[in-house]
Curated annotation (Swiss-Prot):
This is Rod cGMP-specific 3',5'-cyclic phosphodiesterase subunit beta. The gene is PDE6B. It holds the Pfam family GAF. It catalyses: 3',5'-cyclic GMP + H2O = GMP + H(+). A divalent metal cation 1 binds at H561, H597, D598, D718. Residues 854-856 form a propeptide. Transmembrane segments: none annotated. It comes from Canis lupus familiaris. The lineage of its organism: Eukaryota, Metazoa, Chordata, Craniata, Vertebrata. GO terms for biological process: cAMP-mediated signaling; entrainment of circadian clock by photoperiod; retina development in camera-type eye; visual perception. Oligomer composed of two catalytic chains (alpha and beta), an inhibitory chain (gamma) and the delta chain. Binds 2 divalent metal cations per subunit. Site 1 may preferentially bind zinc ions, while site 2 has a preference for magnesium and/or manganese ions. Residues 71-220, 252-429 form the GAF domain. The keyword Hydrolase applies. It is an enzyme of class 3 (hydrolase).
Length: 856
């Protein structure tokens, strides 16, 4: 039985529930698409309303996207693309809310999203953002009012701005926009443009818009809260670590900044930052004021800090994080230095404002360098600059941060984080005065060292006195081959026999200082170390000449004494046969230590340095002068043109420096008494070996024992003047005494103290007695034990004993004269007393009593 069309229509009208159920089931989009026959699914938006199943499927897909994707832009992009389809809008856009410099703004993040768009085409890169202040455009109005806006005709809307249309060439007719809120705070604004199938967006569109944006709001809230959490975490870490490093270094501002910045660099989220330190001087020097007062110069009219100081950056510290990390310190930077040339740091120092510039290329107030700053191709894109303020509210510097790592401009959270860091830096800069003083002292020290090196170093003319290459070869030593220099030196040097450098009785009294330099060079050739260790011969000559100039022209501790000690060391090693225990490298170091052991001696001892509060005493706690001599020697060796160790490998170099440390410090007589017993045990131990060869093999491998022997050798060398022939020793002793008396004069006049007898000029006649005491108390043990250790050294001990006899004879002679003078004085006193008694008798006084007779 068939029903007519009217009957079916009547049935459906009478049964609305059945009608809804039937059409909801049979007229789904899939059935309609299948009925179309072309195989293309029908767009859901072709229906005015979605069925509940399809709507649920769409919402489930959105939730699934949110769950699977952590990228906010990707999820919101899918939502906007679906909204375009459902609302039949031409396109949708996402504007992110942010604050810079305390001013709120909206910036495009997803722009012109259409149903067929790709994410890469719609995602706006940071350098292409369109930024709307809140007082411009419908999007700004929505952010201000925090309410949805449906503009049916933009020509009738007072808030509409054609700014974006003019940039893109697009024509906007109607707008549907709503804010995304996190509590009372605006996070973003989403906007749909131009209804395609109608004159404007309807109230039904608004409902659908809000329904789908609930998911977008959730996603944006998660993103916003995650960002805030990340910012607070970074801020907490910056506060923690910067505080830790700031209070770890309280004197050196560069180390403070380096430690603080280096430690927190990962939390600052920028490519580069620089800190400009301001000059805190408030009063000018007189020579700067005079031209102004005389009318010859205009008074300063440039910018000033809020407290009236002229803005002068005395130092810029530039910290580089992109590419290879580096830190650069620029003292007294020029005005055209890239960190200052834009004028932004000066403006911040003048105003005290925080400046956040999102696009430096388009900024009209400041002129930043447009091209790359260095070879890496790094270019300034956005900048955040803020003042560093101390507790007195004085601006002491400006911190400027460049290029946020993700390419976006710095926002309010970045400002808060950077400001937290600069607050700590502001407190740390309270120590700039201390740092400045330390820096100046360091600079003065460098200048002083350079001056010393200039006056001590052998110059081009002086080297010709020993290496006459101009006269013989017609060129400078640097242009000569080593063989040529070797032949020339062989002709110039005196040889080993002319001045008896192998003998213990060597005397420098007949030698000039230049001849002693030549003898010093000769000793290195005799040891065979010049060729073995590839010492450049020009360097060797310069070193010996410079060492001789490094000794001051004082009475005893001068270059002659320095050479005598080195010559005695050379003689102990060779003639005394002690070289059998040491390698060539060690002998090389020991002779060099002898040459340098008293360099730059001041003619006063360690005790005087402490009494006079000499800076050396503050620098070195013990063995004051010895450590200074060591440092001076190392200072000369650090100069490339004087470094005779330059061709040693690392291990060899460390070894010779170690031996020099021990040898030179060992010349402190205060340490001599500590090592006497140890040396005596080594000498006694040597007597237990019947075979000399076995003993040599044993001691050669005993590093500690060798060092003790070497230390005692240095003492023997330092005191060797006491073992010279009497005619030499007597003259040298007077030189030593004269230097002691000079120190005694200083103690009496400068320190207002009474010197000890040895240094008292008024007791010069007691010198022989003092010499005998010195020989008995200090010298005898050294040379007696060395003569037991090696019989080849016996001549030194014999001459010591002979010199003692001479001094003893003089001392006895002096004692006899002194005794005779005392007896004569006593007799004179007796005669005076007797004469006085006789005068009293003549004047009627009582007669003296007699033991043999009585006067009646």
């Amino acid at each position: 039985m068939s029903l007519s069309e009217e009957q079916v229509q009547h049935f459906l009208d009478q049964n609305p529930d059945f009608t809804d159920q039937y059409f909801g089931k049979t007229l789904s989009p899939e059935h309609v698409a299948g009925a179309c026959g072309d195989g293309q699914p029908t767009d859901c938006a072709s229906f005015r309303e979605l069925c509940q199943v399809e709507e649920s499927a769409a919402l489930f897909e959105l939730v699934q996207d949110m769950q699977e994707s952590v990228n906010m832009e990707r999820v919101v992009f899918k939502i906007l693309r679906r909204l375009c389809t459902i609302l039949r809008a031409d396109r949708c856009s996402l504007f992110m809310y942010r604050q810079r410099n305390g001013v709120a703004e909206l910036a495009t993040r997803l722009f012109s999203v259409q149903p067929g768009s790709a994410l890469e085409d719609c995602l706006v890169p940071p350098d292409s953002e369109i930024v709307f202040p809140l007082d411009i455009g419908v999007v700004g109005h929505v952010a201000q009012t925090k309410k949805m806006v449906n503009v049916q005709d933009v020509t009738e809307c007072p808030h509409f701005s054609p700014f974006a249309d003019e940039l893109t060439g697009y024509e906007t007719r109607n707008i549907l926009a709503t804010p995304i809120m996190n509590g009372k705070d605006v996070v973003a604004v989403i906007m749909a443009l131009n209804k395609l199938d109608g004159p404007c967006f309807t109230s039904e569109d608004e409902d659908v818009f809000l329904k789908y944006l609930n998911f977008g709001t959730l996603n944006l809230k998660i993103y916003h809260l995650s960002y805030l959490h990340n910012c607070e975490t970074r801020r907490g870490q910056v506060l923690l670590w910067s505080a830790n490093k700031v209070f770890e270094e309280l004197t050196d501002i560069e180390r403070q900044f380096h430690k603080a910045f280096y430690t927190v660099r990962a939390y600052l989220n920028c490519d580069r930052y620089s800190v400009g330190l301001l000059d805190m001087t408030k009063e000018k020097e007189f020579f700067d004021v005079w031209p102004v007062l005389m009318g010859e110069a205009q008074p300063y009219s440039g910018p000033r800090t809020p407290d009236g100081r002229e803005i002068v950056f005395y130092k810029v510290i530039d910290y580089i994080l992109h590419g290879k990390e580096d830190i650069k310190v620029i003292p007294s930077p020029p005005a055209d230095h890239w960190a200052l040339a834009s004028g932004l740091p000066t403006y911040v120092a003048e105003s005290g404002f925080i400046c956040n510039i999102m696009n430096t290329a388009a900024d009209e107030m400041f002129t930043f360098q447009e091209g790359p700053l260095d070879d890496s191709g790094w270019v300034i894109k956005n900048v955040l600059s803020m003042p560093i303020v101390n507790k007195k509210e004085e601006i002491v510097g400006v911190a400027t941060f460049y290029n946020r790592k993700d390419g976006k401009p710095f926002d309010e959270q970045d400002e808060v984080l950077m400001e937290s860091l600069t607050q700590f830096l502001g407190w740390s800069v309270l120590n700039t005065d201390t740092y400045d003083k330390m820096n100046k002292l360091e600079n003065r020290k460098d200048i002083a060292q350079d001056m010393v090196l200039y006056h001590v170093r052998c110059d081009k003319d002086e080297i010709q006195l020993i290496l006459p290459t101009r006269e013989r070869l017609g060129k400078e030593p640097a242009d000569c081959e080593e063989d040529e220099l070797g032949i020339l030196l062989k002709e110039v040097l005196p040889g080993p026999s002319k001045f008896d450098i192998y003998e213990f009785h060597f005397s420098d009294l007949e030698c000039t200082e230049l001849e002693l330099v030549k003898c010093g060079i000769q000793m290195y050739y005799e040891l065979g170390v010049v060729r073995k260790f590839q010492i450049p011969q020009e360097v060797l000559v310069r070193f010996l000449f410079s060492v001789s100039k490094g000794y001051r022209r004082i009475t005893y501790h001068n270059w002659r004494h320095g050479f005598n000690v080195a010559q005695t060391m050379f003689t102990l090693l060779t003639t005394g046969k002690l070289k059998s225990y040491y390698t060539d490298l060690e002998a090389f170091a020991m002779v060099t230590a002898g040459l340098c052991h008293d360099i730059d001696h001041r003619g006063t001892n360690n005790l005087y340095q402490m009494k006079s509060q000499n800076p050396l005493a503050k620098l070195h706690g013990s063995s004051i002068l010895e450590r200074h001599h060591l440092e001076f020697g190392k200072f000369l060796l650090s100069e490339e043109t004087l470094n005779i160790y330059q061709n040693l490998n690392r291990r060899q170099h460390e070894h010779v420096i170690h031996l020099m440390d021990i040898a030179i410090i060992a010349t402190d007589l205060a340490l001599y008494f500590k090592k006497r017993t140890m040396f005596q045990k080594i000498v006694d131990e040597s007597k237990n070996y019947e075979d000399r060869k076995s003993w040599v093999e044993y001691l050669s491998l005993e590093t500690t024992r060798k060092e003790i022997v070497m230390a005692m050798m240095m003492t023997a060398c330092d005191l060797s003047a006491i073992t010279k022939p009497w005619e030499v020793q007597s003259k040298v002793a007077l030189l030593v005494a004269a230097e002691f008396w000079e120190q005694g004069d200083l103690e009496r006049t400068v320190l207002d103290q009474q010197p000890i007898p040895m240094m008292d000029r008024n007791k010069a006649a007691e010198l022989p007695k003092l010499q005998v005491g010195f020989i008995d108390f200090v010298c005898t043990f050294v040379y007696k034990e060395f003569s037991r250790f090696h019989e080849e050294i016996l001549p030194m001990f014999d001459r010591l004993q002979n010199n003692r006899k001479e001094w003893k004879a003089l001392a006895d002679e002096y004692e006899a004269k002194l005794k005779a003078l005392e007896e004569e004085k006593q007799q004179q006193e007796d005669r005076t007393t007797a004469k006085k008694a006789g005068t009293e008798i003549c004047n009627g006084g009582p007669a003296p009593k007699s033991s043999t007779c009585c006067i009646l």
